[in-house]
């Protein structure tokens, strides 16, 4: 790992409606082709992802080939699920040659034991969010969702996003942030010296 340049990103929330952001990311990948890089994407690369079979999604035809070109030239790619794109699956992983990381995940960074996470599971003060997170991450919920048609999944995803935005209006920033005591406990539980996470956009 010492010969690799490690890059950590999260929460790009790429969306078909925000082409500028997507193009910046694609230029970043292009500029690093052939370099000795390990790119870690710690969740929410996409603003939403309803399944690997949604091939009509413009981001699929733009981002997946770019990631494949990136990894084909020697770069490494590790992807962690976020709260918006936890349905990224084995097909996406195979097409992009990405390693799907469990959350949390321990790595050694130049001798420092480091915990990687998207981070949303540490927002424990937001009880409503944690209940929803537990539901949608269950195998039963995901299997049922993936049985729906593409159109039905898009509509449900839109409804969930609208409800989420409405819910945020009635919550303080502190409630939606990670709980410091929960993060402190993660340091102890995983015996690590550093934590790198996303989700909170701070």
Regions found by a protein language model. Give the residues of each.
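N-terminal short leaders/motifs
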Residues: 47-70, 150, 162-173, 190-195
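Acidic, His- and aromatic-enriched active-site or binding-groove loops in soluble protein domains
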Residues: 108-109, 114, 141
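Active-site-proximal loop/helix segment associated with metal-binding centers of metalloenzymes
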Residues: 119-179
């Amino acid at each position: 790992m010492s010969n690799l340049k490690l890059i950590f990103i999260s929460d790009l929330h790429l969306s078909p409606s925000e082409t500028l952001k997507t193009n910046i990311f694609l230029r970043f990948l292009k500029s690093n082709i052939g370099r000795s890089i390990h790119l870690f994407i710690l969740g929410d690369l996409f603003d939403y992802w309803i399944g690997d079979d949604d091939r009509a999604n413009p981001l699929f035809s733009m981002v997946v080939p770019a990631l494949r070109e990136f990894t084909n030239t020697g770069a490494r790619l590790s992807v962690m699920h976020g709260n918006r794109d936890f349905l990224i699956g084995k097909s996406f992983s195979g097409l992009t040659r990405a390693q799907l990381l469990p959350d949390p995940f321990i790595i050694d960074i130049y001798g420092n034991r480091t915990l990687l996470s998207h981070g949303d599971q540490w927002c424990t003060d937001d009880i409503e969010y944690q209940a929803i997170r537990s539901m949608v991450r269950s195998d039963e919920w995901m299997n049922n969702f993936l049985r729906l048609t593409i159109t039905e999944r898009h509509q449900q995803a839109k409804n969930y996003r609208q409800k989420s935005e409405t819910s945020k209006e009635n919550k303080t920033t502190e409630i939606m942030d990670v709980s410091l005591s929960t993060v402190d406990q993660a340091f102890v539980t995983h015996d690590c010296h550093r934590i790198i996470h996303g989700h909170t956009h701070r």
